[in-house]
Amino acid sequence: MQDGKALQAGTSHYLGTGFAEASGIKYQDKDGNQQFAHTTSWGVSTRMIGGVIMTHGDDDGLRCPPQIAPHQIVIIPMLRDNDEDEAVLAYCRSLRLELLALNVFGEPLRVLLDTKATKASNKRWSWVKKGAPIIVEVGPRDMGEGKAAVIRRDNLYKDDGKLATAFTPRTEFVAS
């Protein structure tokens, strides 16, 4: 862990023959005799989730590795409760479809369009805490200029670049 301590990741137990006797699980030994099986139990516990959080967290929350992130890219539309909102949402839906066409780890990117009726700044902070590897913010001006704010969660670097070039290094990051 970050503090130099170890974490027991799994557990392994010898259970004897009790479960085999209760379930009637037998095998034939080398002499042809029926014997109750000796059983074991092994598993990864919920401590593993804690280990991921402790290893990949910082003061702002989780920094989820792209390989295990439920959503590798989260798109946040910057809505203003005006006539442009539907156009921004349509643009974000189109962007999501473009990103879903990209493959990383042999599968499509996992992209979420966050359409909750919450202020964009609150959504951003929520996704920073949840550890989304890449957060994309799109507002009316961005849409008109073909831009978006692309934020990497691992270093909180924000790039306000053109969409045509914004995702090549980001998808390489997701694939790393």
Summary of predicted features, one role per range:
Residues 1-176:
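NTP/phosphate- and nucleic-acid-binding module
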